[in-house]
């Protein structure tokens, strides 16, 4: 059953206003951070499970969804600073942090630099250096994700039909992908739609990627960590975001790191409720001691 958020609001943190949602009204807080071109509602499937006895928060990162979109200022350290201010504005003390994709990089950086500000860390299909070095080596699935930004499409139906052509989405489409993409777009009076995600911010994010310095963060993490990997490729059998050799390095450096691989899930389906495994692993980790 899809849970409605108990809060779907805006809050000012620092100089920006952020859109956030909260599912559940009791239990320990879990704060979720989404990926590069995503929005808070990508966590609806996980929230439907976890919000039964936890307060699950998710927010649109700067430049995404309904949060403010400054012209410049997009990097992992800047997002981590936003998170620090947001936790203060929401009066959340030592929450569990959960990040998917870019959100995992932000969560990792935050855990390394503000170790007293969280209780546990959950990294979903990211947390290690990208397996490509140049824009030319960027995988087709990421190019597909970015290509939708800044472009108007005649209708929401056509927008989603185009997305369903992607093999890593189309055959797995469900109510959670519907909810997610409904919140991805601005709807204009003529019926056309365009992604809310700020394209220039995403491009700047890529240019500033090195500031995340991921390998330097691992050993600084002081809290129990759960690392989930999507083992299924997207366009090919070996275009995963998180190679297995990277997992070995992460586990070696983070002192208390549990790792679970999901061979039949890809970078997107791991959060969209296609299988119950990710939610079960997260719940087990969250509820443990």
Regions found by a protein language model. Name each.
Residues 14, 45, 57-98, 102, ...:
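Active-site loop/oxyanion-hole signature of alpha/beta-hydrolase fold enzymes
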Residues 19-66:
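Conserved HGGG/HGGXW glycine-rich cap/lid loop of the alpha/beta-hydrolase fold
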Residues 103, 107-111:
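Short helix immediately C-terminal to the catalytic nucleophile in hydrolase catalytic domains
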Residues 109, 119-156:
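Flexible "cap/lid" loop of the alpha/beta hydrolase fold
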Residues 152-208:
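Conserved alpha/beta-hydrolase catalytic His-Asp/Glu region
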Residues 186-253:
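Conserved serine/cysteine hydrolase catalytic core
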Residues 251-264:
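Catalytic histidine neighborhood in serine/cysteine hydrolases
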Residues 262-274:
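Catalytic histidine-centered segment of alpha/beta-hydrolase-like enzymes
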């Amino acid at each position: 059953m899809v849970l409605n958020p108990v809060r779907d609001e805006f809050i000012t943190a620092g100089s920006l206003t952020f859109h956030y949602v909260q599912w559940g009204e009791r239990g320990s807080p879990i704060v979720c951070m989404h990926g590069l071109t995503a929005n808070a509602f990508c966590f609806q499937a996980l929230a439907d499970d976890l919000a039964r006895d936890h307060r699950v928060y998710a927010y649109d990162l700067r430049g995404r969804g309904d949060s403010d979109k400054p012209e410049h200022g997009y990097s992992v350290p800047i997002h981590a600073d936003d998170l620090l201010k947001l936790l203060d504005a929401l009066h959340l003390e030592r929450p569990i942090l959960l990040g998917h994709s870019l959100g995992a990089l932000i969560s990792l950086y935050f855990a390394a630099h503000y170790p007293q500000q969280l209780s546990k860390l959950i990294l979903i299909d990211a947390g290690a250096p990208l397996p490509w070095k140049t824009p030319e080596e960027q995988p087709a699935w990421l190019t597909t994700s970015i290509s939708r930004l800044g472009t108007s499409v005649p209708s929401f139906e056509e927008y989603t039909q185009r997305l369903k052509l992607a093999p890593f989405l189309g055959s797995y489409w469900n109510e959670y992908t519907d909810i997610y993409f409904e919140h991805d777009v601005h709807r204009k009076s003529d019926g056309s739609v365009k992604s809310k995600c700020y394209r220039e911010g995403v491009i700047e994010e890529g240019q500033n990627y090195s500031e995340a310095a991921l390998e330097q963060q691992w050993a600084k993490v002081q809290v129990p960590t759960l690392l989930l990997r999507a083992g299924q490729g997207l366009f090919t059998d070996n275009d995963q975001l998180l190679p297995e050799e990277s997992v070995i390095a992460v586990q070696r450096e983070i002192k208390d790191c549990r790792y679970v691989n999901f061979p039949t899930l890809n970078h997107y389906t791991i959060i969209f409720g296609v299988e119950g495994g990710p939610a079960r692993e997260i719940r087990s980790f969250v509820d443990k001691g």
